[in-house]
Amino acid sequence: MKVVNLTGRIKIGPSEVLHQEVLEPQFIYELEYYLLYYVAIEKVLLTEYKRLELITNENKEMIMKILDKVTKESINPDPTANMSDIAFAIERFVEQNLEGEVPAWHIDRSRNDFQSCAQIMFGREQLLQVIKEMRDLSNSVYKLAKKTVYLPMPGYTHYQAAQIITLGFYLAAVNEQILLVMEKLLGVYDEMNKCPLGAGAMAGGEFEWERNRMAMLLGFSEPRNHALIAVASRDWTLQISSELSNFGVFLSRFVTDLIQWGSSEYKFIDLPDQLSGISSAMPQKKNFPIFERIRGKTAHLHAFYSDFVLGQRNTAYSNLVETSKEAGTHVITMFETFKSTIRLLKTTVDNLSFNEKRMLDVCTEEFFGGFSLANKLTLSSGIPYRRAQVIAGQYILKMMETGFRPEHIDIGILKGIGLEHGLQIKLTSEQLKSAFDVTHNIENKKTIGSTNPNDIKILMDEQEKRYKDIEKQWDKREEYIKKSVSQI
């Protein structure tokens, strides 16, 4: 199997097993995901060859037209013709279609910066798609939060009823996390969007490539300022996967709450039939396996991050197939998994219905006002706060033992407990009643970021402004790419 005019170093092309197990799958992968970027890079290099007066304008235009004919159908992995390497395949395709030799075409160039550049262009495009999905999710969560600012529901700590909140308060927290991740990914994008092209194999080129212009034409903000970093680093895969993995932790917790709320014990939420499942044996059941799918998918995000870390760990800091290709095998799978997760979650958010009566019933069944009662005892009667906590707890226990609900207040029992502690309780019946009132427990919160609907409205107005700014920043970056590459 003789190699056709590609190297003088080896005489025989790739073996069948190497071709089938490694090179052909890699070629097909790059054909699917990188070809568009490879062609764009070739065109930018071509303009530089012309600027450097290494080729004529006539040759430049001829090669440009040939590059336009490079498609998924026009090149293929061939161990003898191109060593099953897509960069060589493009080179061979152009050479075979030239009307005459162009000796300086492809002078002073390497696959290393060529491949690194295409990979980053692919990665940033995928990241832009991720952000679009997250923007859609944010919009859905925001709209639902705004509609439910006044809808009371029980809040839990340690899986026990704790304080009354509103659904809008909870969902505003979800949206806050989404916005935070989109903001953090702006920094990741800006750091990764530095052009490796012109770095050569690892030490730079021997011609004065105009790297700033090459970077601009390919949609980068600037050239990567160190040739070794340009070809050795794949930090962008670690940074993106790290952020998505971390966000996956939060998503899993959010979905866990949804799973609990949808259980037969809670009965807080419901989904339409088209998003629900059934039991094959228990006809009374209506299941929500979509939540389990979403939560299960978040686990893969952590695995992808670990995979990229382990794929790069203990490798030499230089260009390596191990880090540039093998370690990134599942990059596209990570992006697709994340986008799928977000689309599924958005669909559930858009279709959730809430059992408002059930949520309110739980708010009135549990003694959520204990915290407020302790505060009132201290303020009205001068009782030291820790002792006020003890008295409030004893009052609640007594009421539970006698079978009373929170609204069935008994100021006599409370004052009797106070006397047992040698204290005079001056709290009125009206004040005691307010401590266990659902609306009072929501509206009496006064700190910034509390469940008070007024605070949540302020927060959501701020979130709307942040969202618009984030949207503007991402749109600006995407528009810059479109404008830049249109000049090629």
Regions found by a protein language model. Name each.
Residues 47-55, 122, 169, 238-246, ...:
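Short, well-ordered beta-strand elements within core beta-sheets of diverse protein domains
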Residues 119-132, 146, 160-317, 322-341, ...:
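Charged, flexible cofactor/metal-binding loops and thiol motifs
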